[in-house]
Amino acid sequence: HLMTTDDFAIWQAKASDAHQGWISAQNFHAKPGKSIYFAAPDGRIDFAIGIFGNHAVWDGAALAASLPKGHWQFTAASDDLDAGLLESLALGWGLGQYQFHTYRSAAAPAVNYLTLPDGIHADRLIGQMGGIYLCRDLINQPPNHMTPAALQTAMETLAKTHDATLETHSGSILETEFPAIHIVGRAAEIAPRLMDLRWGKKGPKITLIGKGITFDSGGLDLKPSKAMEMIIN
């Protein structure tokens, strides 16, 4: 059950003696991102209460981390929990399950599953999480693996998956058309490149310009030593 701190205060005032005793024994204080669960007579979890506030994405992630591993479903304690808020909580829940296990030899830890509530745009939600997961995977790669060439391979895979187009510019064209990229990266062991990824033909045109920093910092010690150490770290 999803509640605000005010919802919880109202519910607690009407709760059974057993539930109130359990809340007291757990020293539970209703704060956004916190949760408490209650057991059925047979010892299994009967239900849980999760508290959310003004930062639904963060609260959703915190709830996913705090609850016992299993399959969960959101129910609202009041009509104030609209579809948009539910979607933000679900997004946070999904982002809280992220794991980077590319180099892991042992089995990945268990995760918490969520059955999406009615009214949520599942495709949009999964798309958002997929994009953030991809960025996290790229960032978490060790620097000797995530080179400009490796980033190009990742973008080629992304373009193929989503029927997008990718143009990659490298070599002499950078010297004449994109001199800043050429000057900074020309001494690097793995050559710099400019990637132009395009997707979709309908709707307004939106351009996002991203400066993809990989480990190659140009190959030239243009910064003070301490700053270069920070780049490496």
List where the protein language model places each region:
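Cofactor-binding active-site loop characterized by glycine-rich and histidine/acidic residues
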Residues: 217
